[in-house]
From Swiss-Prot:
SUPFAM superfamilies: S13-like H2TH domain (SSF46946). Component of the ribosome, a large ribonucleoprotein complex responsible for the synthesis of proteins in the cell. The small ribosomal subunit (SSU) binds messenger RNAs (mRNAs) and translates the encoded message by selecting cognate aminoacyl-transfer RNA (tRNA) molecules. The large subunit (LSU) contains the ribosomal catalytic site termed the peptidyl transferase center (PTC), which catalyzes the formation of peptide bonds, thereby polymerizing the amino acids delivered by tRNAs into a polypeptide chain. The modification N-acetylserine is found at residue 2. This is Small ribosomal subunit protein uS13A. It is found in: Cytoplasm. The gene is RPS18A. GO terms for molecular function: rRNA binding; structural constituent of ribosome. GO terms for biological process: cytoplasmic translation; endonucleolytic cleavage in ITS1 to separate SSU-rRNA from 5.8S rRNA and LSU-rRNA from tricistronic rRNA transcript (SSU-rRNA, 5.8S rRNA, LSU-rRNA); ribosomal subunit export from nucleus. There is a cross-link at residues 36, 49, 80, 96 (Glycyl lysine isopeptide (Lys-Gly) (interchain with G-Cter in ubiquitin)). It holds the Pfam family Ribosomal_S13.
Length: 146
């Protein structure tokens, strides 16, 4: 195994991707998971689509590779990532498939809950009351309230 010496100024300890600080010391597949809306499977797929070495540290990547990764994460359908892989399929407003990232995840979730409360759906009412939403038993559990 040969020793590869990197240039001194090329390693970045902290990267800024999609309004999130990403640690440059960990491998790129796991470093991308610090971005909200990106899990290990999605991160792995994006790195493969961007032709990035999966064993590289995040701080070792060039600016071009990082831009390619961000571009694929923001427009996954243009890079033949299937719709079932995305976290927002058949959106309620326009019926398209999206993958929401970073700050957008929280705002979309908040909008969905507000819509459910507004139309007085069962799930919305349970959220409003602070009760369990997904059909769990509540006779003996979940009594502690904030």
């Amino acid at each position: 195994m040969s020793l590869v010496v990197q240039e001194q100024g090329s390693f970045q300890h902290i990267l800024r991707l999609l309004n999130t600080n990403v640690d440059g010391n960990i491998k790129i597949v796991y470093a991308l998971t610090t971005i909200k809306g990106v899990g290990r499977r999605y991160s792995n797929l994006v790195c493969k689509k961007a032709d990035v070495d999966l064993h590289k540290r995040a701080g070792e990547l060039t600016q071009e590779e990082l831009e390619r990764i961000v571009q694929i994460m923001q427009n996954p359908t243009h890079y033949k990532i299937p719709a079932w892989f995305l976290n927002r399929q058949n959106d309620i407003t326009d019926g398209k498939d999206y993958h929401t990232l970073a700050n957008n995840v929280e705002s979309k979730l908040r909008d969905d809950l507000e819509r459910l409360k507004k139309i007085r759906a069962h799930r919305g009412i349970r959220h409003f009351w602070g009760l369990r939403v997904r059909g769990q038993h509540t006779k003996t559990t979940g009594r502690r309230r904030a």
